[in-house]
């Protein structure tokens, strides 16, 4: 096998595929590095694709043999049987029929196709993410995948909604229980406040009674104090009267002494009286 430079890629034109590779396969049975395989035997993603470094990514080339479909008509059996959970499908070409012409051929020249030239075809498969599974993909595959995805999503959504309903019912039950507990607490608080109000009322009544009794006691005490003060005032007045009488009596005695001894000096307390009218000889 010829060794190609590193980085070489198999990028033939449609005309090159027909003139070189398909013609060599039909006339000389030379397939080079293109494998012969019935690509319609299974799903495209389950085929034993070759790993050829010359092919571009997600691109493959195969020689596909034709089969008889009644009489001498040769065609490709495109149906894929059901497998697993899939209902099967049909291969189809996305490009349709396209004529490949050699620009060097002149008008009138042609090649009559014999039966031998119709026993094999050259197929190119490409994987397209945004479009179909591949250029010759199954028609029903994407529909089944979409249906399965929608069914799974619907099941998940239903489970989520059921879980949401269960959570809402639980939250509602919790709120109901909390409301009942709160109501019970408030009722207990009211029952507790009523005895406290009664106790405060009784305490106020007792305090009022005590104050009234204290006032009643203060009134006799004030009356007793008034009588005592009057008695003290009378005693003080009597004492002052007695002192006044004593003073008057003492003054009378002093006058009598002065009268009886007019020429003598008398010492009366701290006072000394001298008779200046007397002259010593």
UniProtKB/Swiss-Prot annotation:
Pfam families: NAM. GO terms for molecular function: DNA binding; DNA-binding transcription factor activity. InterPro entries: NAC-dom (IPR003441), NAC_dom_sf (IPR036093). Residues 94-109 have a biased composition (Basic and acidic residues). Keywords: DNA-binding, Nucleus, Transcription, Transcription regulation. Residues 229-239 have a biased composition (Low complexity). It is found in: Nucleus. Its main location: nucleus. Residues 4-156 form the NAC domain. PROSITE patterns: NAC. Residues 109-162 bind DNA. Residues 84-109, 211-249 are annotated as: Disordered. The NAC domain includes a DNA-binding domain and a dimerization domain. PANTHER family: NAC DOMAIN-CONTAINING PROTEIN 82-RELATED (PTHR31989). This is NAC domain-containing protein 6. The gene is NAC006.
């Amino acid at each position: 096998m010829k060794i190609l430079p590193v980085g070489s890629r198999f990028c033939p034109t449609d005309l090159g595929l027909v003139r070189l590779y398909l013609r060599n396969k039909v006339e000389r049975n030379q397939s080079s590095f293109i494998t012969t395989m019935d690509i319609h035997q299974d799903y495209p993603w389950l085929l034993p694709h070759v790993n050829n470094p010359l092919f571009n990514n997600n691109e493959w080339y195969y020689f596909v043999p034709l089969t008889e479909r009644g009489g001498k008509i040769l065609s490709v059996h495109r149906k894929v049987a059901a497998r697993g959970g899939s209902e099967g499908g049909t291969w189809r070409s996305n490009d349709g029929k396209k004529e490949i012409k050699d620009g060097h051929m002149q008008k009138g020249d042609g090649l009559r196709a014999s039966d031998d030239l119709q026993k094999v075809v050259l197929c190119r498969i490409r994987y397209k993410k945004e479009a179909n599974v591949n250029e010759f993909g199954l028609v029903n595959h994407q529909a089944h995948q979409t249906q399965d995805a929608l069914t799974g999503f619907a099941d998940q959504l239903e489970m989520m909604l059921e879980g949401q309903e269960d959570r809402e019912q639980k939250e509602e039950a919790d709120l109901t229980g909390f409301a009942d507990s709160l109501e019970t607490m408030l009722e207990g608080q009211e029952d507790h406040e009523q005895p406290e109000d009664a106790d405060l009322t009784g305490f106020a009544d007792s305090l009022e009674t005590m104050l009234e009794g204290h006032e009643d006691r203060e009134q006799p005490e004030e009356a007793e104090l008034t009588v005592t003060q009057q008695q003290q005032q009378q005693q003080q007045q009597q004492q002052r009267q007695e002192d006044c009488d004593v003073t008057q009596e003492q003054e009378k005695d002093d006058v009598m002494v002065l009268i009886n001894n007019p020429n003598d000096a008398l010492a009366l307390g701290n006072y000394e009286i001298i008779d200046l009218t007397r002259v010593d000889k």
